[in-house]
From Swiss-Prot:
Its main location: membrane. Residues 119-145 have a biased composition (Polar residues). GO terms for biological process: lysosome localization; vesicle-mediated transport. The gene is Kxd1. It is found in: Lysosome membrane. The keyword Chloroplast does not apply. It comes from Rattus norvegicus (Rat). This is KxDL motif-containing protein 1. Residues 92-177 are annotated as: Disordered. Component of the BLOC-one-related complex (BORC) which is composed of BLOC1S1, BLOC1S2, BORCS5, BORCS6, BORCS7, BORCS8, KXD1 and SNAPIN. Associates with the BLOC-1 complex. Interacts with BLOC1S1. Interacts with DTNBP1/BLOC1S7 (via coiled-coil domain).
Length: 177
């Protein structure tokens, strides 16, 4: 039934004769070149992704460290301004004639002007606990440990101090004279 000149053989023979082997080889070579390029590109993207991940981790740690530093500085400044307000109040009570021309509202400033809500501090503390990251690089120091800053941790919050001397020290010196 199958003769050598059957229709299927003739069709396949003519179909194969239409395909140029040089063109097929050129297509295969082009596909191999593209595959090599895609593999190199993929490797470069993986390296870039890994490097970006490492840099993100480093920057996140530095950001958290700087955020903690800013929160500490804000807390210190709040304490300083509270002491200044207390000192102003005491001076206003001791020397009312010197403060008579200043309106009462400017002597006792409210803390309502705080632009940073307390929820941000809570968020920072929570994110620090979850990441557990800490930047210990020596090039960035906390302001409380820097040489130019005075350590005020030994002073009670209710006692204002000027240049390391409390107001009560000055009063005792004036009494002795």
């Amino acid at each position: 039934m199958d003769t050598p000149d059957s229709a299927s053989r003739v069709f396949c023979g003519r179909f194969l004769s239409m395909v140029n082997t040089d063109d097929v080889n050129a297509i295969i070579l082009a596909q191999k070149n593209m595959l090599d390029r895609f593999e190199k590109t993929n490797e470069m993207l993986l390296n870039f992704n890994n490097l970006s991940s490492v840099r993100l981790q480093q920057m996140s740690e530095r950001f958290m460290h700087h955020t903690r530093t800013l929160v500490d500085m804000k807390r210190d400044l709040d304490s300083i301004f509270r002491r200044i307000r207390t000192l102003k109040g005491k001076l206003a009570r001791q020397h009312p004639e010197a403060f008579s021309h200043i309106p009462e509202g400017s002597l006792l400033e409210d803390e309502d002007e705080d632009p940073v809500p307390p929820s941000i501090t809570t968020t920072i503390a929570t994110s620090e606990q979850s990441t557990g990251s800490c930047d210990t690089s020596p090039d960035t120091a906390s302001p409380s440990f820097s040489p130019g800053f005075e350590d005020l941790s030994h002073i009670r919050p209710g006692s204002p101090a000027i240049n390391g001397h409390s107001q009560t020290d000055d009063e005792e010196e004036t009494r002795e004279e």
